[in-house]
Swiss-Prot record:
Lineage top rank: taxon: Eukaryota
IQ domain mapped to chain residues: 89-118
Disulphide linkage map: none
InterPro entries referenced in this protein's UniProt entry, alphabetically: IQ_motif_EF-hand-BS, IQCF
Molecular function via GO: calmodulin binding
One Pfam short name: IQ
Protein name per the record: IQ domain-containing protein F3
Length: 154
C-alpha cells in the first residue's frame, strides 16, 4: 500500500484546479459573447424599429401634406364661388339701379310732356290785338321739351 505523497506524477489537485479554471474562463468568455450578441441584437432591433417609425412618419407627413392641399383647394374654390356670386349680385344691382333711374327719367319726361301739352294752346284760338295796348310776343314751343339729363356712372 503506497502513500499518496510518494507518487511521482503531477498533482491531481493542481490539474483539477487548472481544469476548473479553464472551465470558468470558458464560461466567462461564453457569457461575454452571449452578452455581446444580445447587445448587437438589441442594436439591430432598434435600427429596424427606427426605420419602421421613420417610414410611418414619412407616410403620415405625406398624408398631412395631401390633406392640407385638399383643404386649401376647397377653401380657394369656396372663395371663388362666393366671389362669383358677389359679382353677379353687384351686376344685377347696377342693372336694376340703371333701369329704375331710366324709368324715373321717362316718368319725368312724360310728366313734362303732359304739362306742356296742357299749356300749349292751338294757334287758331289765339286772337291777339296787334294794334293798341296788348302786344304779346308768343313763341311757339317745339314739339319736344328741352331738358338735359346727366347720367353719372360710379
Amino acid at each position: 500500500m503506497g502513500s499518496k505523497c510518494c507518487k511521482g506524477g503531477p498533482d491531481e489537485d493542481a490539474v483539477e484546479r487548472q481544469r476548473r479554471q479553464k472551465l470558468l474562463l470558458a464560461q466567462l468568455h461564453h457569457r461575454k459573447r452571449v452578452k455581446a450578441a444580445g447587445q448587437i441584437q438589441a442594436w439591430w432591433r432598434g435600427v429596424l424599429v427606427r426605420r419602421t417609425l421613420l417610414v410611418a412618419a414619412l407616410r403620415a407627413w405625406m398624408i398631412q401634406c395631401w390633406w392640407r392641399t385638399l383643404v386649401q383647394r376647397r377653401i380657394r374654390q369656396r372663395r371663388q364661388a362666393l366671389l362669383r356670386v358677389y359679382v353677379i349680385q353687384e351686376q344685377a344691382t347696377v342693372k336694376l339701379q340703371s333701369c329704375i333711374r331710366m324709368w324715373q327719367c321717362r316718368q319725368c319726361y312724360r310728366q313734362m310732356c303732359n304739362a306742356l301739352c296742357l299749356f300749349q294752346v292751338p294757334e287758331s284760338s289765339l286772337a291777339f290785338q296787334t294794334d293798341g295796348f296788348l302786344q304779346v310776343q308768343y313763341a311757339i314751343p317745339s314739339k319736344q321739351p328741352e331738358f338735359h339729363i346727366e347720367i353719372l356712372s360710379i
